């Protein structure tokens, strides 16, 4: 006979008592352990209590397995105080579920938001701003102050919010193709709702504009920033969708990454330092160098997305001419850019530190050749193409890290 068909009598708060008449042999504990309802957290003692006084023994013999707390008239717990002992562990766990759920949801949303802002470009923008401002500060160390650093930090926040705004629009309107090309993005992976994405995008645009006004950046910088907010929207938002056309996509990258951001940051940096804007040779070099890279990156960015672009009908250069052709052409122009940088250092030693520029760009060029060879060896698979494109971003970041130290 199973123990679960017995009546139980709770005489003490820490024990369950079961009548000995219910056990078929003296080896009661062995039978008890064999039962699927054995409870390890409370010791069980046997007593001489007879169940016939409270329920029929005939029913006990024929009752099917119901469990210690099943809905049966003979299985209700009974205590001296006529009150069942509350399960304090269960109650505590229910009380602790609420804060635990809040923490988990907050952590998941934070992780999805970090993926939403695209970490690699986010870090790249931070380095670009720091490098351009740092180059001006190194030339004028006497102007350093903590208030200056605080104002510069607020300017960095403006640029980062602009970056979130641009990337947010791009992900919202590219959701269908991202499910194929970039399934790890939070919207494509359904880790974040479209409503939350819109909130982050609009908040970033409004907050950055308000911060610009608070910093009193002047009419020229504020109007220029508003223009880039509009141009950034036209890149992704229908019916414009400049990114769908190779020419308009390249033009946007050239104006935004190559000229716009660099000019905006340098102008703001010198204004913060109380200096007039000036076209110095190092700044002219970085504008020309990065503008060329921005054109190359706008072409090569579609190499990892060939399959998805074909399915959604996007006519990108890798789709038309093939990934291998575009990669070889893009890498070739990248190498020419490095050759030009070495030539500039040789021709204008009075403006540039050749002992830094020449070996650094030679190393960058060698690394690019090796990475292109690895991509060709991998037959331009998506994973290898992603790695190659990210490596190009690292090369551009390395150029900005080098920038404050190339000027004589």
From Swiss-Prot:
Places the protein is found: Plastid; Plastid, Chloroplast membrane
Effect of residue 174 to A: Loss of catalytic activity
Reported tissue expression: Expressed in trichomes.
Residue range covered by the transit peptide: 1-46
Main location as per UniProt: plastid
PANTHER family to which the protein is assigned, alphabetical: HOMOGENTISATE SOLANESYLTRANSFERASE, CHLOROPLASTIC
Subunit structure: Homo- and heteromer. Interacts with PT1L, forming a functional metabolon.
Protein name: 2-acyl-4-prenylphloroglucinol 6-prenyltransferase, chloroplastic
Taxonomic source organism: Humulus lupulus (European hop)
